[in-house]
Amino acid sequence: MWTQRAGVDIIKHSEGSDPAAVVFDAVKAGIARDADVIICDTAGRLHNKKNLMDELKKIARIVNNNAPDSRVETLLVLDATTGQNAVNQARQFNEVADITGIILTKLDGTAKGGIIISITDDLQVPVKLVTVGEKIDDIQPFSARDFVEALFE
């Protein structure tokens, strides 16, 4: 559905397939098609599920080994409604995936996402994007000024 809305290709396997194999095929297809960007969505991973974190580590290794000259962004998607647990979650994801940025979701609700200050300070990674809705146009570049102003509204 999202790929159709965005007008992009999708590489997928049947349900239950090894996620790392899907990423391997996606990287190879992206290189063969001379793609500018390859997005690998590993949604649904919980930092306290060792097998899922091991898969994530394997995925990162596959990307780095098969596209060594590519610029790789590893973005952690955090829910703005998540509290203190988000700090621990971010640390654990960073240990296996070398996070380069954060996407903060659900800023359209009552959550202000103040925990992101602790996370960015702790990990020294920037917030790159925020979402303020569920449409593709609701993904916006992060503005520190707007974020701080919203915290104090």
Where are these regions (language model features)?
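C-terminal structured domain segments across diverse proteins
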Residues: 83-84, 92-96
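Helical hairpin unit composed of two closely spaced alpha helices linked by a short loop
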Residues: 100-101
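Short beta-alpha junctions and helix-cap segments that line functional grooves
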Residues: 88-89, 114-116
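Short Gly/Pro-enriched loop/turn and capping motifs at secondary-structure junctions
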Residues: 81-83, 108-110
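Phosphate-centric recognition/catalysis
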Residues: 105
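Nucleotide-state-sensitive switch-loop elements of NTP-binding domains
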Residues: 1-73, 97, 110, 114, ...
